[in-house]
Amino acid sequence: MELRYLRYFVAVARERHFTRAAKALGISQPPLSQQIKRLEEEVGTPLFRRLTRGVELTEAGEAFYEDACKILALSDAALEKARGIARGLNGNLSIGITSSDAFHPKIFALIRQFQVQNMAVQVHQVEANMSSLTAMLAEGELD
């Protein structure tokens, strides 16, 4: 089974319509329908119920959708991790945060954004008072 089939399946499941999914994927509708048909043959059961105005997932399609989304997310994460390592963005990052700033929305958002963009980097947060953080920085315990 190719990842491409999973991407096509997820697009149709989200759009609930072959033509809209094809447009979102940048392909024409007939090849998309053919790929979904091949996927259903490979799985051995229909994944969609064809309706007059779109499609809906079958029970098997619902279960397959959940796993397909997980597989695609893992595939994307693996790709980003490898790219990060190739750019030298891997390892650990230790940052210090004062207790008063630990839950500040902007700081939390920045850390989360960094983690998403640099999946190969493990971020460790140390919460302490300013004098302790300064000492830890001087000792090389924080980046």
Curated annotation (Swiss-Prot):
Q: Which domain of life is it from?
A: Bacteria
Task: Name the SUPFAM superfamilies on file.
Answer: Winged helix' DNA-binding domain
Primary role? Regulator of the budABC operon for 2,3-butanediol synthesis.
The residues that make up the annotated DNA-binding region are 18-37
Q: What is the designated name of this protein?
A: HTH-type transcriptional regulator BudR
- One Pfam assignment: HTH_1
Q: Name one GO molecular function term.
A: DNA binding
Q: Which UniProt keywords apply?
A: DNA-binding, Transcription, Transcription regulation
Concerning InterPro entries, the annotation shows:
Tscrpt_reg_HTH_LysR (IPR000847), WH-like_DNA-bd_sf (IPR036388), WH_DNA-bd_sf (IPR036390)
Which family is annotated? Belongs to the LysR transcriptional regulatory family.
The segment(s) forming the HTH lysR-type domain are: 1-58
GO CC terms in record? protein-DNA complex
